[in-house]
Amino acid sequence: MQIILLEKVVNLGNLGDVVKVKDGYARNFLIPQGKAKRANQANLAEFEARRAELERQQAEKLAAAQEVGAKLEGLMVQIARKAGMDGRLFGSVTNADVAEALAAQGFEIERSTVRMPDGPLKQIGDTQLEVALHSDVVVSITVSVLGEQQQ
């Protein structure tokens, strides 16, 4: 299916690009999330009429992400969980837990933006994680998992 991108999409293209993608990817992900429209004459004309507005919105989103990224870069988040004597957690720390801890510090981010390349954290200690605020803004934070005292 041919689509027009309404914003930058990682590994696909930039604002205004007409690209060919699989039908399911377009119908189930890109179009419902407002990232793309079908490429037909009417939508192409509408896009060209709104191009300046869309570019301005993209620039505003990027500036906001860079501003939050500057505050978030290098931040340390502490999360306490019950752990055994050997340092293994009873359970794990997921990206939702990290997003919740960041929200407690005043940063409203989606849990899907927290990247955990090795999966959920299952050990006590410090771990470097990435937060993708925008396709062009990826910052690094440190998550310190602490063991709670057992009674």
Swiss-Prot record:
Record GO biological process: translation
Record PROSITE patterns: RIBOSOMAL_L9
Gene3D superfamilies associated with the record: Ribosomal protein L9, C-terminal domain, Ribosomal protein L9, N-terminal domain
Domain of life the protein comes from: Bacteria
Annotated InterPro entries: Ribosomal_bL9, Ribosomal_bL9/RNase_H1_N, Ribosomal_bL9_bac/chp, Ribosomal_bL9_C, Ribosomal_bL9_C_sf, Ribosomal_bL9_N, Ribosomal_bL9_N_sf
Keyword RNA-binding among UniProt keywords: yes
Xref: SUPFAM superfamilies: L9 N-domain-like, Ribosomal protein L9 C-domain
Pfam families, alphabetized: Ribosomal_L9_C, Ribosomal_L9_N
The entry's keywords: Ribonucleoprotein, Ribosomal protein, RNA-binding, rRNA-binding
MF-aspect GO terms: rRNA binding; structural constituent of ribosome
Cellular compartments per GO CC: ribonucleoprotein complex; ribosome
Keyword RNA-binding in record: yes
Similarity comment: family membership: Belongs to the bacterial ribosomal protein bL9 family.
Family matches, as NCBIfam families: L9 (TIGR00158)
PANTHER family referenced in this protein's UniProt entry, alphabetically: 50S RIBOSOMAL PROTEIN L9 (PTHR21368)
Physiological role: Binds to the 23S rRNA.
HAMAP family: Ribosomal_bL9
Protein name: Large ribosomal subunit protein bL9
Organism placement in taxonomy: Bacteria, Pseudomonadati, Pseudomonadota, Betaproteobacteria, Rhodocyclales
